[in-house]
Amino acid sequence: MKKFFLTAAALMGAASMFAQGWPANYEGVMLQGFYWDSYRASKWQNLEAQADDLAPYFSLVWVPQSANCTSSERSMGYDDLYWFSNYNSSFGNEAELRSMISTFKSKGIGTIADVVINHRKTLTSWTDFPVETYRGLTYKMNSTDICSDDDKGGTLTWANKQTPKVSLSSNKDTGDDWDGMRDLDHNSSNVQNVVA
């Protein structure tokens, strides 16, 4: 799963650079605009206020995951619940995020976002992902998008006790198991569609 995440992040970063017309032999410098538990230091408004200071030295600022987690104001974003419809995070709201990106862009700084696509939080039970609509398309993950060995088999045990029984994917996790949230089956065409 780690290899998949790193590969996906690298590809998305490379794709966005080409989409912005950056040269193939890009030699810019990226600043990581966050560190663990940097809720205050990495707020969108704080990063935006530093744009003039950053512009002479950095071409990109890597920002933390921006989707809503609903857990608390002290989440680094790795317990993401909403991917498309709610960008209110520990770092600020959607308007502040857009303002930061716009300011960075006006100063010649690109923005690259950390993304979490290997696991996802659910609403109230182990398998109820939120339904989201983005640009006219509705996205829904199902119990069959969860790896069969999620939570060291705990999710399967839970699923088998439900009436009616809840089905999971027949595929095992392709990375490390993490029992904090549901591990997603990246061999699932639905997961691939939602992630892409």
Q: What positions do the PLM features span?
A:
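Positively charged n-region of N-terminal signal peptides that target proteins for export
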Residues: 1-4
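Sec/Tat signal peptide C-region and signal peptidase I cleavage site
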Residues: 12-19
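Substrate-binding/active-site clefts of carbohydrate-active enzymes
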Residues: 21-29, 34-52, 56-196
